[in-house]
Design a protein with these regions (language model features):
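Catalytic cores of alpha/beta
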Residues: 56-91, 111
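Short, well-ordered secondary-structure micro-motifs
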Residues: 12-15, 50-53, 81-83, 106-108
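Conserved, mostly hydrophobic/aromatic
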Residues: 2, 39, 61, 84, ...
Length: 119
């Protein structure tokens, strides 16, 4: 699994303090595909903010690479989980939930139920 910390389509590093000019999609496409199982795509403009997932940007990233994507950053509601779970055909196969669980916006059981309702 490779983690891609992304701000406006570009890779960020060093605890997100270094904004590169490296396009995230181009970087991932440059790796040998046989060594990659999936990509954790973190939208660092939303991570920990509870602003909601940037669904459009996440889908665009997932559709542009040949690997399953685990979405991260901004999850704030069951609706975010449900919307992401509908994107399996676009390459989004998982989600990282952090602050929303810590802040008790919903329970893990509720998140699982919302995924089962979509499938």
């Amino acid at each position: 699994i490779i983690g891609a910390d992304v701000r406006n389509g570009m890779i960020a590093s060093h605890g997100w303090t270094n904004q590169s000019k490296v396009n995230a999609v181009n970087l991932i496409k440059g790796f040998n595909p046989s060594i990659i199982n999936s990509i954790i795509y973190t939208d660092i403009t939303r991570d920990g903010s509870l602003q909601g997932v940037n669904l459009e940007q996440t889908i665009n990233f997932a559709k542009s690479i040949p690997h399953p994507v685990i979405a991260s950053g901004g999850v704030s509601s069951i609706e975010d989980i449900s919307n992401l779970s509908k994107q399996i055909s676009n390459g989004v196969e998982g989600v990282v939930i952090g602050r929303a669980l810590y802040d008790k916006k919903f329970t893990f059981a509720d998140a699982l139920k919302s995924i089962k309702l979509v499938k």
